[in-house]
């Protein structure tokens, strides 16, 4: 047998093997529903089974895990859902979640990270294994507590399972057993998922043991808020201290308690925001990144509106937004100041019209430029985190342009009114 014929025979054998593998695993390149058994402790807030979705590829072992966003809750009304800041998916996750356009995932198109081919944006993880970690627990993927809420309907109390942290760990365990060890892993999430990806980073890191790993947490900042701070010092303190209790964050089995117990260098149990920099300290070879807008109107409302009557009862919506942004901007500076590890970075443009300047990575990366630093969009930050070359990017827009100069920004502005 000649070398040429040997190579041809070998190539054919490899091709047949690959095709056989693809045929044997019909779920490649499409969404596969995974329902976690009750024995894992995983559940949605209403007690229904927890389901998440996987879109696999046989071509590499790299993986991106997307933590879904949505509102949150700590009372009966909000846990029933129905409005922007309330719990999303209050009735659980149906089996057809990723094929139902009316669901928040929008067939995976909600972010460029969760679509093989996205009509508006390319990102290198589109060729990776994709895991969509759904959100149905009203606790920004961090809780481990069961509560009974009856404040709006005492005759019909609601038992609600804040099991976000349990769900996340169960997903990581499933991945470790059913998927290859990742050569490269990106943990990301938007809004509530931005918090979730940050808070559960260590769990995925230690469970999956990827060769390389990065975090891109979008618009779910854990601000630098000591437990004993006053509202004047740290406006988010009322929110932080509320969710500590209702979601069991620093209870004996709480996520914060367990994280700091395992990794004392990760931060301080009395300041949940300390993990922002803490991840860079305990995982010095990883690249840790945070992104959001300076004029975010949604997460700021979640953080302050229920706790400050002057905001909730503002005379006009413009007044409400102005008061929200004053508090929001007050907390950005100390949040950034604590990011001292050199492997921690951020990308913080001023605003865009899409979704009330909430989330830089949903729909499209357009509208996220920082022109003064010659950065076209947040995708350059994502590439910086993933490529692992040079210092981790730190970009903060200080000179917002009064008129768009990039076509991608103009397109995002045109698109904004079309997005519900």
Which residue stretches match the model-derived regions?
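C-terminal His-loop and adjacent cap/lid subdomain of alpha/beta-hydrolase
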Residues: 27-420
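N-terminal secretory signal peptides that target proteins for export/translocation
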Residues: 1-9
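Sec/Tat signal peptide C-region and signal peptidase I cleavage site
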Residues: 22-26
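Bacterial N-terminal signal peptides
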Residues: 12-21
């Amino acid at each position: 047998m000649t070398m040429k014929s040997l190579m041809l025979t070998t190539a054919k054998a490899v091709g047949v093997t690959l095709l056989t593998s693809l045929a044997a695993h019909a779920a490649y390149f499409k969404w596969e529903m995974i329902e976690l058994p009750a024995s894992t402790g995983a559940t949605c807030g209403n007690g229904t089974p927890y389901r998440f979705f996987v879109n696999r590829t046989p071509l590499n072992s790299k993986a991106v895990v997307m933590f879904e966003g949505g509102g949150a809750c700590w009372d009966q009304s909000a846990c029933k859902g129905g409005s922007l800041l309330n719990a999303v998916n209050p009735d659980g996750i149906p089996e057809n979640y990723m094929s139902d356009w009316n669901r928040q995932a929008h067939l995976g198109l909600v972010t460029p990270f969760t679509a093989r081919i996205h009509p508006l944006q390319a990102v290198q993880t589109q060729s990776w294994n994709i895991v969509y970690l759904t959100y149905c627990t009203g606790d920004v993927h961090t809780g481990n507590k069961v509560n009974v809420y009856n404040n709006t309907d005492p005759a019909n109390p609601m038992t609600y399972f804040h099991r976000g942290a349990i769900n996340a760990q169960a997903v990581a365990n499933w991945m470790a057993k059913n998927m290859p060890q990742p050569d490269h892993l990106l943990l990301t999430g938007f809004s509530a998922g931005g918090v979730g990806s940050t808070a559960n980073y260590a769990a995925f890191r230690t469970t999956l043991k990827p060769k390389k790993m990065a975090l891109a947490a979008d618009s779910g900042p854990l601000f630098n808020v000591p437990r004993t701070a006053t509202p004047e010092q740290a406006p988010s303190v009322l929110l932080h201290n509320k969710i500590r209790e209702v979601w069991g964050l620093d209870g004996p089995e709480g996520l914060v308690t367990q994280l700091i117990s395992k990794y004392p260098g990760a931060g301080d149990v009395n300041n949940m925001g300390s993990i922002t920099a803490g991840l860079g300290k305990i995982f010095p070879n990883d690249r840790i990144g945070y992104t959001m807008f300076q004029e975010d109107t949604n997460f700021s409302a979640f953080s302050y509106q229920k706790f400050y009557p002057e905001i909730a009862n503002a005379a006009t919506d413009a007044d409400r937004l102005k008061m929200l942004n004053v508090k929001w901007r007050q907390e950005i500076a100390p949040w950034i100041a604590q990011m001292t590890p050199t492997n921690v970075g951020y990308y913080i443009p001023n605003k865009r019209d899409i979704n009330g300047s909430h989330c830089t990575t949903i729909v499209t990366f357009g509208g996220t430029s920082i022109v003064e630093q010659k950065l076209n969009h947040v995708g350059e930050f994502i590439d910086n985190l993933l490529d692992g070359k040079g210092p981790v990017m730190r970009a903060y827009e200080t000179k917002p342009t009064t008129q768009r100069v990039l076509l991608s920004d103009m397109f995002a502005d045109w698109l904004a009114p079309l997005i519900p």
